């Protein structure tokens, strides 16, 4: 996931690190020049108490810069209005970006209280900027003369900034602006409350097992990890499982004790919906109402209409069109998978009744039966070190870039950092990794930046990028972290986001972003390499003796790539539809979230009760605590793009083809928002203007289509004829996304 900074409200703010000359503030590292290697944040000196005064000082400085732009008596120009805006807010961006990154990865009660205080402060500050009539008049004056701007990036930035002002309410009446300010302030606070509640509920639950019989079925490595978790909590003689994915998913997959699987899954499923202080139901209702109020103030019938107006999809109807065309084929395949699992369950127990907490357990039995593959036998070849080196080797083969470990300040002892060097050995940026789950860290995985690439005085200012994950810890204190397939693929995914930031070649920070439904293309295209046989031969080595992964295991991975894809796709589509459903409401009435979800998914669309949406509303942090509101469909949308783009590598005859990689880098990864995604760019492999879900399903070369050899509509899972494969990829590969059910996110 691409982590959206809270400063997305003003993408024109520059993230360079300049010193404050106020002597009374010099003890605050956030207000000093960062004389650290590569200008990284001095994490070793930053304390929670530094943030509020630094942000208050940043707001004061930013206001002074805005006043200077407004009071300038010269004729409004790109330089004295648009560029000045893009360069403004440096101190504030410095402080608040650092705060946001730390609050997601290394939070505590003090940081959460600060977030509640700072979020409405930041919201009010940017409202005061965007709703400043005198400032907007200057922006509009430059915008009205934009055809006279000859530099393409300057013209594009002018258009983007004008659009941001309009979408922020610059054309509203004074009364409407005051109402909008109140709405934005409330929304900023509610989003923080939602996230804090979710973190509290995630941390509150533990399953403590004191009877070894209850561990039956669990691999030794999982048992050892649970025992280590207990010892870390000062508890001996027990095993502790938590709701973090490296603990939850293996338990659901392997534990023979059905009652305990049910207990674990219900604890996950019912987060933030117990009617206590962490219940998010009222918060979600308030958010939905306020978002609708905001949309109507700005002239839109629904919040989804407002949100999608600036995206590739343009309208909720277009997003629905893709999801709806994929829904029935995915659901039909999931039903087929269910029947296979029910048959196994009946053969073993005499009972084919099936619940949602049975899916992982019996799906694993299907995988073992059909493909003779146990994911635990893959872990020794997927050590964290090997996977990371594989990603680095792939990047070197595609673009010639290299990664050098560096010693820089970090916010947690487990973090590591690398300098990224281009093929000419020039500095591209700094890349942090934070791999493991811990209390105070949000679940899932994401990529963020504390500094976006831009140019200053003709010189590129390199970005600072961070990848945060929650992969399996080493089972013992001095052990090696051994990943499963999903965790390995997650790192490839987030690394794709990192490359998007590291390769950026835009002059202005306001051009650093792209459309929400385009942003997942760089991440999802990287997933395609993760388990290519040629790629596995490069990095999948046994952690103890360095032996390469046996060819029969590589073949099993390839053959089992069809495994469980009906489920995976259906629960992803269900979450995407839930997001759109609640944000296309045009008249608000109090919502019973559970009832609304069942009506829209189970009753209207036929979702079977054994499958829950990937995220239910009370813990759907992407849309209520993050930047994906009415935008979760973007993962499916970008999947359409990524399969077409990756096919360019396949058709070259070499998935490591350097010319194709350089073209992809130049035309996609470097360009930022220099063009809108719907504008023509010189990269022919992104069919974002002609997305047709049904034809995509039936078309060869994409994820869901009819097998040319056996005519199976949804993939030849039975025949497995070797002739049905080409270039190490299955002809009728099924599944919109390969990640396992809970994928990459919280």
Go through each PLM region and give its residues.
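Positively charged n-region of N-terminal signal peptides that target proteins for export
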Residues: 1-4
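Intrinsic-disorder-associated, low-complexity terminal segments enriched in Asp/Asn/His/Tyr and depleted
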Residues: 702, 721-731
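C-terminal, non-catalytic "cap/extension" segments appended to globular domains
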Residues: 23-50, 57, 238, 369, ...
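Short pre-active-site segment immediately N-terminal to the catalytic Zn-binding motif
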Residues: 472-491
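C-terminal motif of bacterial Sec signal peptides marking the signal peptidase cleavage site
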Residues: 16-19
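Active-site-proximal, well-structured secondary-structure segments within enzyme catalytic domains
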Residues: 157, 189, 196, 200-242, ...
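N-terminal helix-rich structural modules
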Residues: 25-219, 649, 710
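Short His/Asp/Glu-rich catalytic/ion-coordination signatures at enzyme active sites or charged loops
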Residues: 35-50, 99-118, 140-182, 242-282, ...
